Curated annotation (Swiss-Prot):
pH effect summary: Optimum pH is 7.0.
Protein family per UniProt: Belongs to the glycosyl hydrolase 32 family.
Organism of origin: Fusobacterium mortiferum
Protein name: Sucrose-6-phosphate hydrolase
Active site feature: E18
Keyword tags: Carbohydrate metabolism, Glycosidase, Hydrolase
Record-listed E.C. numbers: 3.2.1.26
Keyword Hydrolase applies: yes
Pathway: Glycan biosynthesis; sucrose metabolism
Induction: Induced by sucrose.
Record's signal peptide: none
Alphabetized GO MF terms: beta-fructofuranosidase activity
Length: 33
């Protein structure tokens, strides 16, 4: 999946209160196979 799809899935899975954590996942995006 590409980066946009990955971000969209994070947005769907994570509540707004955890948006911060989204930045940590983005930072680790290169770890996604």
């Amino acid at each position: 999946m590409d980066k946009k799809e990955y971000i969209n899935r994070l947005n769907e899975q994570k509540p707004l209160q955890e948006m911060x954590s989204r930045d940590r996942y983005l930072x680790n995006f290169h770890l996604i196979p």
